[in-house]
């Protein structure tokens, strides 16, 4: 029993370290993004998207998010919402799951629900430029033009 607890604690500490390393990587990339020219900015932004879209500790959740993204590409939007909701239920602290669902909600015209999810994203990751852009689009659709400019 003691050996099993040791293994579990070792696994959990490795997962926590991975999440901390991921946060450090994001901080580094955002600092680079601030300093770089537009020619290298898209490469840095893509690296950030990759980190956001990869769950820090659970490959199964990454696979669920990928499945939802495939459903969006296939225009199966309501099914995609179900899949993204499942990812949110499994880890409500994963900003990208909220962001993906917010995007699909926007696509089907559920702007207030999309804004609610965007608020969650920005509470979890205030630098999420995808959510910030989405927030502007939602505010335009809701005719909140002053907020859209912010």
Question: PLM ranges: what are they?
Answer:
Residues 54, 73, 107-108, 141-142:
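Register position in tetratricopeptide repeats
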């Amino acid at each position: 029993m003691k050996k099993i607890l040791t293994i579990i604690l070792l696994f959990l500490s490795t997962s926590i370290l991975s999440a901390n390393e991921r946060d450090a990587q994001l901080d580094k990339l955002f600092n680079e993004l601030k300093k770089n020219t537009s020619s290298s900015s898209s490469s840095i932004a893509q690296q950030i998207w990759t980190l956001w879209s990869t769950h820090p500790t659970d490959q199964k959740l990454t696979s669920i998010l990928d499945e939802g993204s495939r459903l969006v590409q296939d225009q199966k939007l309501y099914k995609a919402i179900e899949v993204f909701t499942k990812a949110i239920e499994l880890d409500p602290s994963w900003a990208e799951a909220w962001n993906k669902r917010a995007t699909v909600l926007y696509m089907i015209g559920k702007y207030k629900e999309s804004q609610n999810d965007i608020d969650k994203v920005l509470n979890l990751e205030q630098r999420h430029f995808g959510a910030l852009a989405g927030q502007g689009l939602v505010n335009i659709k809701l005719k909140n033009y002053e907020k859209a400019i912010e």
